[in-house]
């Protein structure tokens, strides 16, 4: 059994899938299974994956139930001990899965970890380097708009 599940939720995101899945195919750590949860898309998303990435486990929902339900559905269907939630419009570095897996394994008490998100439009800027929460539970993106070099 693989050690990691990568769960990708989708709704009519065909235009993003080649970039996302090509990056996953280049991972240095290969002990992962990809689960693709489709929220009733009307585009060619599932057909594209069946043709180009047939190893992907496709979970087709009959309607657009939204981000959370799709992620929860994929997480429940996975059998791997660790789960990475990944957006369909994401392009990851080749060591993405490896670094998250190694990071979570180093901390016995950790229940979650997060990747550094770099802006797609401005590749030298941080989109999110972890979140801060205030007393009311509002989340704030750490490092938003700051140089990537500050978060190495």
Show the residue positions of the predicted features.
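Glycine-rich, basic loop-to-helix element that forms the pyrophosphate-binding segment
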Residues: 61-78, 88
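Short, acidic, metal-binding catalytic loop of nucleotide-sugar glycosyltransferases
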Residues: 22-31
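Short beta-strand/loop segment that forms part of the nucleotide-sugar
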Residues: 31-40, 59-61
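Acidic helix N-cap motif at the loop->helix transition within catalytic regions
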Residues: 43-51, 95
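Cell-envelope/extracellular polymer assembly enzymes that use nucleotide-activated donors
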Residues: 2-5, 33
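Short aromatic/hydrophobic "clamp" motif used to bind/position activated sugar donors
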Residues: 83
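Conserved donor NDP-sugar-binding/catalytic core segment of glycosyltransferases
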Residues: 93-127, 131-134
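Conserved short acidic donor-positioning loop in nucleotide-sugar-dependent glycosyltransferases
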Residues: 24, 39-44, 65
